[in-house]
Amino acid sequence: IPLRRQRQMCIRDRATKMGLKLNGIHIATNKNDILHRLFSSGIYSKNKTIKSLAPSMDISVASNFERLMVDVLNEDRAKVSELMNNFPENSIDFNNLKHWKKINSFFTSSKTEDQEIKECVKKVVSETGYLIDPHTATAVSGCPPIQNESILTFATAHPAKFPEVFNDVEGFEENIPLELKNIFEKQQKFVKLNNKYEDIADFISSNYAS
């Protein structure tokens, strides 16, 4: 799973509890690797966000993370609140928490750098003819091969949104929908507004309200 929020991981985790047969979930990150560091070390700590080729994954804190913590802390919501209220000033050490070892054994993780993203995109399109976006590439590149097991990778975006990644990738132009090509050729228009609710509301009601 190319992960930018905890939500995707939690959905699959809940699905296994409802009967979906999964042997594990692999969490793929880009260079903003807060979750990879967590599953590698047991320490949840915030770092500075770094710009990458997979921009939707450029996070320093995983939203919805409390959902996993509820499981780790055996439904102790007061403890979850205490730890999160002190974060990110204080990192969270999961290693001594009751259910961490069991949960951590179900998840693996990886970190994919920008160059690895580019290489993965080129490899997949050359071998299969299928063009994946940079977020999906983190999952394809990061997930280790598993013998005699089926691997399901979640694709998350259309590659045409990321022309700066694919300019030198064969087959990119053919994968851009005509509607999107037409948008790229149009003149960009925008209006600058003051950072005030009243000004924004007036602009919307004056120009777009029916």
Residue ranges and their predicted role:
Residues 23-26, 129, 150-153:
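Beta-sheet entry/capping signal
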Residues 1-7, 11:
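Single conserved hydrophobic/aromatic residue that forms the stacking wall/gate
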Residues 13, 20-29, 33:
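Mg2+-dependent phosphoryl-transfer active-site scaffold
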Residues 11-17, 36-41, 164-167:
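Short acidic, glycine/serine/threonine-rich loops at helix termini
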Residues 134, 149-151, 162-165:
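Extended hydrophobic-aromatic, low-complexity segments
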Residues 13-21, 141-147:
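Alpha-helix C-terminal capping segments
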Residues 27, 31-134, 138, 169-210:
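Active-site/ligand-binding loops adjacent to catalytic centers
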